[in-house]
Amino acid sequence: MSIYDIAVENYDGSTYLLKRYKGKVLIIVNTATNCTLNDQFNKLEMLYKKYHKYGLEILSFPCNDFNNQEPGLIKDIYRVYKYKFGITFPIHAKINVNGEHEHPLYTLLKCKQPGLFGSQIKWNFTKFVVDQQGNIVKRFLPCDNPNQMEKLIRQLLK
């Protein structure tokens, strides 16, 4: 299965296939507003503003899998992302990234780029970089600053 065959749901309930991003470099990240790592929203947004015009897309997937750090309804989460954090990149419906109900996207991401200690997502803000052909090229840890991805993003966009 290709990443482009996977359907995802937008914050508004509409669904689409990831094939709409063929030819783009993607950063896919599970996010949470109440996480202590939420300062990464600003850094991700800066990358998005800098490289979006060259073909970068950042896909945010709110996730409540870790310590109830993303409770609430997606309509409320969307407002916080937009108005508190100033996010302009795509925000999706809440998903599970581990376990029995994990989203197929995360099943694929973890299969192609397992972590250091197994395939489970350990925390919010685990970041995956996907190239223009749909290859999942690198997994970044939650504690990795999004700016650490910039060199790879530049290389892929050339």
Swiss-Prot record:
Keywords, comma-separated and alphabetical: Oxidoreductase, Peroxidase
Gene source species: Staphylococcus epidermidis (strain ATCC 35984 / DSM 28319 / BCRC 17069 / CCUG 31568 / BM 3577 / RP62A)
CDD domains cross-referenced by the UniProt entry: GSH_Peroxidase (cd00340)
EC number: 1.-.-.-
The protein's name: Glutathione peroxidase homolog BsaA
Highest taxon of source: Bacteria
UniProt xrefs under InterPro entries: Glutathione_peroxidase, Thioredoxin-like_sf
One of the GO biological process terms: cellular response to oxidative stress
Residues forming the catalytic site: 36
Family recorded in the similarity comment: Belongs to the glutathione peroxidase family.
Lineage: Bacteria, Bacillati, Bacillota, Bacilli, Bacillales
GO MF terms, alphabetically ordered: peroxidase activity
